[in-house]
Amino acid sequence: CKETGSNQFVGNWPGVTVEKKEGRLKGHKDVIVTDLPGIYSLSPYTLEEVVARNYLVGERPDVILNIIDGTNLERNLYLTTQLVELGIPVVAAVNMMDVVKKNGDKINISQLSTELGCEVCEISALKGTGITEAAEKAIKAAQSNTKMIPQHTFSGVVEHALAHIEEAVLHDMPEGQQRWYAIKIFERDEKVLAMMNIPKDK
């Protein structure tokens, strides 16, 4: 990894065979980068999704640097909206921008940032461009502890239900975490229901 150099630890996540990679960020000895498995959603259907979700929800890192494939934007943005809902500062780095431009396509980074409610920047992992800048933006977001305000909203009925769940069930939880848990309870997510001791048929 270019940004961590050779100072990297590779092992497995506890209890599973999914590889775990961690390293210190070049020029920032106090910054540890944890490379999570590549996923498209926080729904725990695959082992990779379970590992990534458990880490994000349980460990609550200071910031999430979400690498997005610019050539397949729509598929990647579903995860980004879920990450913003976690209440953890998010920086979305749109990768393969060189390919996007070569294909004659355009991505309005400023508008995307507004729509997602998080910082968005361009990178090309292949050419090594924008990576240091993305890391610096992530550090800045972590240090400022920017409050994430999800821009994605549901229909009025669903939003009303989510507000009711937050008030009735999640009032003791930090405000920034309530929306994600409310959505998962609304979806009848088995792992969240079990964690919150909520009967499945309630």
Regions found by a protein language model. Name each.
Residues V10, Y40, P44, T71, ...:
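Catalytic cores of large soluble enzymes that bind and process phosphate-bearing ligands
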Residues P14-V18, I32, E48-V51, R60, ...:
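Helical mechanochemical/support elements of P-loop NTPase systems and associated helical scaffolds
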